[in-house]
């Protein structure tokens, strides 16, 4: 039995965590008796609902609600997991457009990170390691991941595709040459990205559990 909180903090949210007290968390655990709890830590808007040092904390955070959840769940032997938005990160797309996937019109996608770019190494992995190491969280459920991947027309991605396949350009329509190869190239890019962060966490924090929502399903 588990509890899943799916908050998705935004820049406009205020007093995040103001009512998250040890007494409140204990009351929930005593009433529900869950085996695990999953709380939000970074939703699709890209803001973190705890005072992260490596990510982008929401401006309306009060205290450290994640620390409260971890301390009380640990005292009661209840596993604590976090919801983490992977490919979807609107804040990062706005602040670091070079991290985003590029649409066919040459503009950065407003929400989808490039699975070929530095986002995984510069934000995703460091933040998951912060959660595992600094907070002692048991694992992360990565949402907004495989189902959010888009065809990436970034210049470097297209050059790599052309070198890999011999195509002269990236196809834009299903009737264009190399369309299936283009889709599969982007799918494989996601698989490489997924393996990269799973392997990184297993290397540094082997007990930290990682799951990517809808991975290896019909959404992938």
Q: What is the predicted function of each stretch?
A:
Residues 1, 33-35, 74-80, 136-138, ...:
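Short, well-ordered coil/turn segments that N-cap beta-strands
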Residues 1-45, 76-78:
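N-terminal structural segment of carbohydrate-active enzymes
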Residues 30-65, 88-109, 151-156:
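Aromatic-lined carbohydrate-binding/catalytic grooves of carbohydrate-active enzymes
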Residues 5-7, 39-43, 82-86, 144, ...:
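A cross-domain feature marking catalytic cores of carbohydrate-active enzymes
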Residues 82-135, 144, 166-183, 195:
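Active-site-adjacent "subsite" loops/lids of carbohydrate-active enzymes
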Residues 4-20, 48-63, 107-125, 175-193, ...:
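The substrate-binding groove and active-site-proximal loops of carbohydrate-active enzymes
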Residues 29, 73, 80, 124, ...:
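Conserved, mostly hydrophobic/aromatic
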């Amino acid at each position: 039995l588990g509890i899943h909180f799916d908050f998705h903090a935004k820049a406009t949210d205020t007093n995040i965590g103001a009512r998250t007290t040890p007494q409140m968390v204990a009351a929930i655990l005593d009433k529900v008796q869950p085996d695990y709890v999953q709380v939000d830590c970074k939703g699709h808007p890209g803001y973190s609902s705890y005072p992260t040092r490596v990510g982008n904390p929401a401006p309306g955070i009060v205290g450290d609600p994640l620390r409260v959840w971890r301390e009380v769940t640990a005292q009661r032997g209840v596993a604590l997991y976090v919801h983490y938005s992977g490919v979807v990160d609107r804040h990062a797309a706005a602040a670091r457009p070079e991290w985003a996937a590029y649409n066919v019109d040459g503009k950065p996608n407003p929400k989808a990170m490039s699975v070929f770019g530095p986002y995984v190494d510069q934000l995703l992995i460091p933040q998951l390691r912060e959660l595992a190491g600094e907070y002692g969280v048991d694992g992360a459920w990565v949402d907004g991941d495989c189902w959010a991947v888009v065809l990436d027309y970034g210049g470097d991605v297209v050059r790599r595709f052309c070198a890999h396949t011999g195509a002269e350009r990236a196809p834009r329509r299903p009737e264009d040459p190399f369309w299936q190869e283009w889709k599969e190239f982007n799918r494989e890019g996601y698989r490489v990205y997924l393996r990269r962060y799973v392997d990184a966490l297993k290397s540094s924090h082997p007990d930290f559990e990682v799951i990517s929502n809808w991975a290896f399903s019909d959404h992938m």
